Protein backbone atom coordinates (compact mmCIF):
# COMPACT_ATOMS: atom_id res chain seq x y z
CA UNK A 1 0.00 0.00 0.00
CA UNK A 2 2.78 2.47 0.82
CA UNK A 3 4.45 2.07 -2.55
CA UNK A 4 1.16 2.63 -4.37
CA UNK A 5 0.67 5.88 -2.45
CA UNK A 6 4.19 6.92 -3.41
CA UNK A 7 3.39 6.23 -7.07
CA UNK A 8 0.40 8.59 -6.72
CA UNK A 9 2.60 11.26 -5.14
CA UNK A 10 5.20 10.85 -7.89
CA UNK A 11 2.55 11.18 -10.61
CA UNK A 12 1.18 14.37 -9.06
CA UNK A 13 4.73 15.76 -8.78
CA UNK A 14 5.46 14.88 -12.40
CA UNK A 15 2.33 16.73 -13.53
CA UNK A 16 3.18 19.76 -11.41
CA UNK A 17 6.73 19.93 -12.77
CA UNK A 18 5.62 19.51 -16.38
CA UNK A 19 3.22 22.40 -15.96
CA UNK A 20 6.15 24.46 -14.69
CA UNK A 21 8.24 23.42 -17.70
CA UNK A 22 10.58 21.32 -15.57
CA UNK A 23 9.25 17.85 -16.36
CA UNK A 24 11.01 14.55 -16.02
CA UNK A 25 10.30 10.96 -17.03
CA UNK A 26 9.87 7.81 -14.98
CA UNK A 27 10.16 4.67 -17.11
CA UNK A 28 7.28 2.86 -15.40
CA UNK A 29 4.89 5.72 -16.16
CA UNK A 30 5.79 5.92 -19.85
CA UNK A 31 2.86 4.46 -21.75
CA UNK A 32 1.76 4.68 -25.37
CA UNK A 33 -2.03 4.80 -25.41
CA UNK A 34 -2.21 5.00 -29.19
CA UNK A 35 0.28 2.34 -30.27
CA UNK A 36 0.54 0.37 -27.05
CA UNK A 37 3.23 -2.18 -26.36
CA UNK A 38 4.63 -4.21 -29.25
CA UNK A 39 2.24 -6.93 -30.42
CA UNK A 40 4.41 -9.94 -29.57
CA UNK A 41 4.96 -8.74 -26.02
CA UNK A 42 1.25 -8.17 -25.42
CA UNK A 43 0.61 -11.89 -25.06
CA UNK A 44 3.67 -13.52 -23.60
CA UNK A 45 5.83 -10.91 -21.96
CA UNK A 46 9.56 -11.36 -22.09
CA UNK A 47 9.83 -14.52 -24.18
CA UNK A 48 11.75 -16.55 -21.60
CA UNK A 49 12.32 -20.13 -22.68
CA UNK A 50 11.06 -19.50 -26.21
CA UNK A 51 12.66 -16.35 -27.64
CA UNK A 52 15.80 -16.40 -25.52
CA UNK A 53 17.63 -18.60 -23.02
CA UNK A 54 20.08 -18.08 -20.20
CA UNK A 55 23.44 -19.75 -20.79
CA UNK A 56 25.66 -20.47 -17.79
CA UNK A 57 29.47 -20.36 -17.98
CA UNK A 58 29.34 -24.18 -18.09
CA UNK A 59 27.02 -24.15 -21.10
CA UNK A 60 23.80 -25.12 -19.33
CA UNK A 61 20.59 -23.71 -20.83
CA UNK A 62 17.75 -22.33 -18.72
CA UNK A 63 14.60 -20.43 -19.76
CA UNK A 64 15.88 -17.25 -18.06
CA UNK A 65 18.63 -16.11 -15.70
CA UNK A 66 16.28 -16.29 -12.73
CA UNK A 67 15.92 -20.06 -13.15
CA UNK A 68 19.67 -20.76 -13.34
CA UNK A 69 20.62 -23.41 -10.81
CA UNK A 70 17.10 -24.81 -10.49
CA UNK A 71 17.54 -28.27 -12.01
CA UNK A 72 13.79 -28.49 -12.66
CA UNK A 73 14.29 -25.83 -15.34
CA UNK A 74 17.50 -27.14 -16.91
CA UNK A 75 16.63 -27.35 -20.61
CA UNK A 76 19.90 -28.71 -21.96
CA UNK A 77 23.37 -27.44 -22.79
CA UNK A 78 25.22 -25.83 -25.65
CA UNK A 79 26.75 -29.14 -26.76
CA UNK A 80 23.52 -31.16 -26.92
CA UNK A 81 21.01 -28.36 -27.42
CA UNK A 82 17.58 -28.35 -25.81
CA UNK A 83 16.92 -31.87 -24.62
CA UNK A 84 14.10 -31.11 -22.20
CA UNK A 85 11.49 -29.86 -24.66
CA UNK A 86 8.74 -30.10 -22.03
CA UNK A 87 10.11 -26.98 -20.35
CA UNK A 88 10.17 -25.10 -23.66
CA UNK A 89 6.60 -26.21 -24.36
CA UNK A 90 5.50 -25.11 -20.88
CA UNK A 91 6.96 -21.65 -21.50
CA UNK A 92 5.31 -21.48 -24.94
CA UNK A 93 1.97 -21.74 -23.15
CA UNK A 94 2.87 -19.11 -20.56
CA UNK A 95 0.75 -16.15 -21.67
CA UNK A 96 -2.15 -13.96 -20.58
CA UNK A 97 -4.69 -16.50 -21.82
CA UNK A 98 -3.17 -19.29 -19.69
CA UNK A 99 -3.29 -17.21 -16.52
CA UNK A 100 -6.74 -17.18 -14.97
CA UNK A 101 -6.06 -13.98 -13.00
CA UNK A 102 -5.17 -12.14 -16.21
CA UNK A 103 -8.35 -12.88 -18.13
CA UNK A 104 -10.37 -9.99 -16.68
CA UNK A 105 -7.50 -7.64 -15.85
CA UNK A 106 -7.48 -4.30 -17.66
CA UNK A 107 -3.66 -4.27 -17.68
CA UNK A 108 -3.06 -7.71 -19.18
CA UNK A 109 -1.81 -6.44 -22.52
CA UNK A 110 0.65 -4.07 -20.85
CA UNK A 111 2.24 -6.53 -18.43
CA UNK A 112 1.58 -9.64 -20.54
CA UNK A 113 0.99 -11.76 -17.47
CA UNK A 114 4.08 -10.65 -15.65
CA UNK A 115 7.33 -12.43 -14.93
CA UNK A 116 7.28 -16.24 -15.08
CA UNK A 117 10.06 -16.47 -12.50
CA UNK A 118 8.20 -14.26 -10.04
CA UNK A 119 5.07 -16.36 -10.54
CA UNK A 120 7.04 -19.54 -9.97
CA UNK A 121 8.81 -18.21 -6.89
CA UNK A 122 5.57 -16.87 -5.38
CA UNK A 123 3.11 -19.62 -6.38
CA UNK A 124 5.24 -22.53 -7.62
CA UNK A 125 3.69 -22.21 -11.07
CA UNK A 126 4.80 -20.12 -14.06
CA UNK A 127 1.19 -19.93 -15.29
CA UNK A 128 -0.08 -18.14 -12.23
CA UNK A 129 0.24 -14.39 -11.81
CA UNK A 130 2.49 -12.80 -9.19
CA UNK A 131 -0.06 -10.91 -7.10
CA UNK A 132 2.20 -8.18 -5.73
CA UNK A 133 3.65 -7.52 -9.18
CA UNK A 134 0.15 -7.34 -10.66
CA UNK A 135 -1.03 -4.86 -8.08
CA UNK A 136 1.96 -2.59 -8.64
CA UNK A 137 1.76 -2.87 -12.44
CA UNK A 138 -1.91 -1.87 -12.42
CA UNK A 139 -1.09 1.10 -10.20
CA UNK A 140 1.73 2.25 -12.49
CA UNK A 141 -0.61 2.06 -15.48
CA UNK A 142 -3.29 4.03 -13.62
CA UNK A 143 -0.73 6.72 -12.80
CA UNK A 144 0.52 6.77 -16.39
CA UNK A 145 -3.02 7.28 -17.67
CA UNK A 146 -3.61 10.01 -15.09
CA UNK A 147 -0.48 11.82 -16.31
CA UNK A 148 -1.56 11.45 -19.96
CA UNK A 149 -5.01 12.84 -19.13
CA UNK A 150 -3.53 15.81 -17.25
CA UNK A 151 -1.13 16.56 -20.10
CA UNK A 152 -3.94 16.36 -22.67
CA UNK A 153 -6.01 18.72 -20.55
CA UNK A 154 -3.08 21.12 -20.24
CA UNK A 155 -2.49 21.02 -23.99
CA UNK A 156 -6.18 21.69 -24.65
CA UNK A 157 -6.12 24.71 -22.32
CA UNK A 158 -3.02 26.06 -24.08
CA UNK A 159 -4.69 25.66 -27.48
CA UNK A 160 -7.80 27.50 -26.28
CA UNK A 161 -5.64 30.42 -25.13
CA UNK A 162 -4.18 30.85 -28.63
Identify the role of each PLM range.
Residues 1-52, 56, 69-74:
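Radical SAM enzyme [4Fe-4S]-AdoMet core and its adjacent flexible, acidic
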Residues 68-162:
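Flexible mid-to-C-terminal extensions adjoining Fe-S/redox cofactors in radical SAM and related proteins
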Amino acid sequence: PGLKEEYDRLAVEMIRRRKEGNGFNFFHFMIDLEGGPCVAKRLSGCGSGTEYLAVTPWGDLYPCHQFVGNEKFLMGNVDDGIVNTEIRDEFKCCNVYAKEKCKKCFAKFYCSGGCAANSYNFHGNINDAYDVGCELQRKRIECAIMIKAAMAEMEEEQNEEK
